Amino acid sequence: MMTYIVFILSTIFVISFVGFSSKPSPIYGGVGLIVSGGVGCGIVMSFGGSFLGLMVFLIYLGGMLVVFGYTTAMATEQYPEVWVSNKVVMGAFISGLIVEVVFVLCVLNSEELKGLFELNGMGDWVIYSVEDSGVFSKEVMGVAALYSYGVWLVIVTGWSLLIGVIVVLEVTRGG
């Protein structure tokens, strides 16, 4: 049952990102990001990261709802364009979905999928030891992996947030 839930959440996650990338109107782009953020937090929570999922939900969606509310108020159209009103936008949406399906099929058919990093053993993770037994903490492991193996991800995320703030400031100033 858990596999089906994660599969459905992942499908909604991909469709919302394809919908965001082929947005015909800023309102639908914001809705796509909000849906993908909420579903992404649900995926994280389904894998046992309840604290991380809740924090991302509160911080990401709380902050982004303010930004989307402000930018939507600035860019409101009386009759917003939808996906089916323009053949080019609908074609981009469908082609994005086809590319995602082909990618998933290629990944499922490949015998070996190599990751971006390798783990050298249990010594790379934080272990709580009590006498003869040790316990992993999932959230401590995630934070340790993020700042050791995923340092490039932190840098790209920080840079993307900075560029996003600059773009929002330029758009609202009319530059």
Swiss-Prot record:
This is NADH-ubiquinone oxidoreductase chain 6. The chain crosses the membrane at residues 1-21, 25-45, 47-67, 88-108, 149-169. Keywords: Electron transport, Membrane, Mitochondrion, NAD, Respiratory chain, Translocase, Transmembrane, Transmembrane helix, Transport. Belongs to the complex I subunit 6 family. It is found in: Mitochondrion membrane. One of its GO terms (molecular function) is NADH dehydrogenase (ubiquinone) activity. It is a multi-pass membrane protein. It comes from the Eukaryota. PANTHER family: NADH UBIQUINONE OXIDOREDUCTASE SUBUNIT ND6 (PTHR11435), NADH-UBIQUINONE OXIDOREDUCTASE CHAIN 6 (PTHR11435:SF1). It comes from Rhinolophus monoceros (Formosan lesser horseshoe bat). Its EC number is 7.1.1.2. Pfam families: Oxidored_q3 (PF00499). GO terms for cellular component: mitochondrial membrane. It catalyses: a ubiquinone + NADH + 5 H(+)(in) = a ubiquinol + NAD(+) + 4 H(+)(out). InterPro entries: ComplexI_Subunit6, NADH_UbQ/plastoQ_OxRdtase_su6, Nuo/plastoQ_OxRdtase_6_NuoJ. Core subunit of the mitochondrial membrane respiratory chain NADH dehydrogenase (Complex I) that is believed to belong to the minimal assembly required for catalysis. Complex I functions in the transfer of electrons from NADH to the respiratory chain. The immediate electron acceptor for the enzyme is believed to be ubiquinone.
